[in-house]
Amino acid sequence: MTPELNWLSDPTVFAVNRLDAHSDHVCYRTVQEAAQRHSSLRQPLDGMWRFVWSSCPAQRPADFWREGADLSGFGTIRVPGHMETQGYGQLQYTNTLYPWDGRSALRPPQVDLNDDPVGSYAREFDLDAGLRGQRVCISFQGVEQAMYLWCNGKFVGYAEDSF
């Protein structure tokens, strides 16, 4: 499947290859892991990620998700964290109904592709040895608008509102 930018404004597409909502319990391999509250069944990806902010989708780096892509223009950002509170884009305050208020005359599900900031994140990691050969799922808990996910250069899925 090829990811499409128009999914952002298509109300019939809100998830592609996403698991159904479910209870998110923490599971442990052993009683000792439970006592220590550290599960070898999870691999946190918190920390510093490669990052570049773009003012709109057309300005985002093309093909940054490909294996071996040149990320020399990327900075870093702490994950978890909001890009706006880390110096990128404009903060959204609760006294403004929508981020585009006063800038664009939009009605949902329209998206102003000329004024829709994009954060492009990249992270390299090795899967923990205990997880190799197992079914592995990735969870993003806090993507504000929408996200497209690639792993090892292959499109994995699309999701909106991961809160």
Predicted segments, located by residue:
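Accessory beta-strand-rich segments of carbohydrate-active enzymes
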Residues: T2-D20, C27-Q36, R50-S54, H82-Q86, ...
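Surface-exposed, flexible loop/turn segments at secondary-structure boundaries
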Residues: P57
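Generic detector of ordered secondary-structure context
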Residues: L41-P44, R66, P117
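Short Gly/aromatic-enriched secondary-structure transition segments
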Residues: R60-P80
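Mature N-terminal segment immediately following signal peptide/propeptide cleavage
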Residues: L41-W53
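Hydrophobic residues on conserved beta-strands that form the core of alpha/beta folds
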Residues: D46, L71, Y121-A122
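Aromatic- and acidic-residue-enriched carbohydrate-binding clefts of CAZyme catalytic domains
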Residues: D101-R103
